[in-house]
A protein has these predicted regions:
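Preference for long, amphipathic alpha-helical scaffolds in soluble/luminal domains
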Residues: 2-418
Length: 418
């Protein structure tokens, strides 16, 4: 999710907390929390106002650094740990972490899930592994406590479930080896039950196989590429640090009489492949009230789509988009900051592309320069921890599937990293 849309979603979550309604699709016209001011913390990545994305961009930076063999600086890890509330949740950003969280503190499910993934990736080589372990457990416990009856999560605690938030939580479960099917709501619903409710059938004329962000007020689903990229990864049981699955298999869309999360994920990959086939990039519509009404390239979600396609065994379909990003994303990444560099690094990793030679940009160098200098790669450990995040529950997931229509068990097993 791009920072501007995180800002809008955070604002809408604030509205929900105040009791004025449930969180819906992001809108820049919504009221927003007061942006932070003053000097930024020394341990934080990026130089822009972190009100809406401080924890998110820090977490993505950690994931990308571990994926390239670097261990984030202890100062940076300590900053992220300090953002956690006593109940285990993470807000989007706390300007003064010495003040305890209260009822007015905006707890952010996306930030919490991203932080859980990040801390799980760095904990073994951090200065305080036990502290990081405790933070991961507390974050996971909080996410369980705010799970909606339908099995999913909204952006803010208590908000209506959406595909993106539910997917990033599934990624956190993947990173910590927790089975999503064991993460059930009071009604006995799993995160996959929630995701399937957002999946469009292959017969849908506008978005066959896609996922919606949320149903509209009338309950109708509309294809959303951002949600589809996120839900495709989640349906495959993957975290944000996913890798290329092999052998290659062109994604197709198939409706089952009894839908499954993995089939829905492959249908999502089919939608992404078709959407990227012509321009090789996704687009974002103008935000409400914008003077420029033309669609613009969506660099961040294009990178996410590349990861999702590669994880689904469709790296051939992902490569044109990856090459488009190599040629066109430099200015966007420079303007957007560390989270953008991290997204591009994860896309490069998923397609086995060198992130140090990404077009004319060394993505690793640019990311590392955006915050405290990380520890140099340890060749004995390399990115082992990051690798483990990607395969947290692949084996039990495959065994639990039994039979998957259209996908051989050998194909699924070959997607494992170990």
């Amino acid at each position: 999710m791009n920072t501007v849309r995180r800002a809008a979603a955070t604002a809408l979550a604030a509205v929900a907390v105040l009791g004025t309604g449930a969180v819906g699709q992001a809108s820049a016209a919504a009221p927003s929390p007061t942006p932070s001011t003053g000097k930024l913390p020394a341990g934080l990545y990026g130089t822009k106002d972190p009100t809406y994305d401080g924890v998110w961009r820090q977490s993505l930076s950690f994931l990308a650094q571990r994926a390239t063999g670097y261990q984030p600086a202890d100062q940076a890890v300590e900053w992220l740990l300090g953002q956690q509330c006593d109940d285990g949740a993470f807000p989007s950003y706390r300007a003064d972490a010495t003040k305890p969280c209260d009822a007015k503190t905006m707890r952010d499910t996306n930030a919490t899930a991203a932080a859980v993934q990040a801390l799980a990736a760095v904990r073994r080589q951090s200065a305080a592994p036990e502290k990081a372990d405790q933070a991961v457990k507390a974050g996971s416990d909080w996410l369980r406590s705010v799970q909606n009856k339908d099995g999913g999560w909204g952006y803010g605690a208590g908000g209506a479930s959406d595909a993106n938030s539910t997917s990033v939580v599934v990624g956190a479960l993947a990173a910590t080896g927790v089975r999503p099917t064991a993460f059930t709501s009071a009604e006995g619903r799993t995160p996959y039950d929630a995701l399937l409710a957002f999946a469009l059938p292959c017969s849908d004329k506008e978005g066959p196989g896609a996922f919606a962000y949320q149903p509209d007020k009338a309950g109708k689903l509309f294809a959303n590429a951002d949600a589809t990229a996120a839900a495709t990864l989640a349906g495959l049981g993957k975290s944000m640090v996913a890798t290329k699955a092999s052998p290659e298999q062109a994604p197709t869309c198939t409706d089952l009489s009894k839908p499954t999360s993995e089939r829905a994920a492959l249908n999502g990959a089919s939608y992404l492949a078709k959407t990227l086939a012509t321009t090789h990039h996704l687009v974002q519509p103008p935000m409400p009230g914008a003077t420029d009404t033309a669609e613009q390239p969506d660099f961040g979600n294009t990178a996410d789509a590349v990861v999702a396609l590669s994880a689904a065994g469709a790296s051939k379909e992902a490569m044109p988009a990856l090459e488009w990003l190599e040629k066109n994303s430099a200015a966007w990444a420079k303007e957007s900051g560390p989270a953008a560099y991290a997204q591009l690094i994860l896309a490069a990793r998923a397609t086995e592309t060198d992130p140090r030679k990404f077009g004319s940009v060394d993505l690793v160098e640019q990311l590392n320069a955006a915050g405290p200098a990380p520890k140099s790669p340890d060749t004995s450990a390399s990115s082992t921890t990051a690798d483990e995040e990607d395969s947290g529950f692949d084996l039990w997931w495959i065994i639990g599937i039994g039979t998957v229509v259209g996908v051989g068990i050998g194909f699924l097993l070959s997607g494992r990293k170990k």
